[in-house]
């Protein structure tokens, strides 16, 4: 059984809320990738209660990223649920200090697995 911290961002208001999910709801997320969408109802959420404002019931949640249990960020260009060291010049997991700087960094792949601790999602309105 997996346990995830789910950070849900509302792009209209700019508010983000963090909730913890376990059990069957968390297992529905395993195997999904960054960029995939899932119905909020499928996870058993009432987003109007969580955010305290009126949010329609037919919204989807789009996975935008996350981190694993050791804090390594997920990258959309690394496929699979694995952790790898890659040479990167920009993007998630690296902020260059100089122009043209590249470094070898450890990152996590784009697929959700039980080793993921936090999943970032945003609300996609119909």
UniProtKB/Swiss-Prot annotation:
Segments crossing the lipid bilayer: none
SMART domains tied to this protein: Ribosomal_S6e
UniProt entry keywords in alphabetical sequence: Ribonucleoprotein, Ribosomal protein
InterPro entries listed in its UniProt record: Ribosomal_eS6, Ribosomal_eS6_arc, Ribosomal_eS6_CS
UniProt record, GO biological process: translation
GO cellular-component term (any): ribosome
Domain of life: Archaea
PROSITE patterns hit by this protein: RIBOSOMAL_S6E
GO molecular function terms listed in the Swiss-Prot or TrEMBL record: structural constituent of ribosome
Protein family per UniProt: Belongs to the eukaryotic ribosomal protein eS6 family.
HAMAP family reported for this sequence: Ribosomal_eS6
Protein known as: Small ribosomal subunit protein eS6
Organism encoding this protein: Thermococcus sibiricus (strain DSM 12597 / MM 739)
Encoding gene per record: rps6e
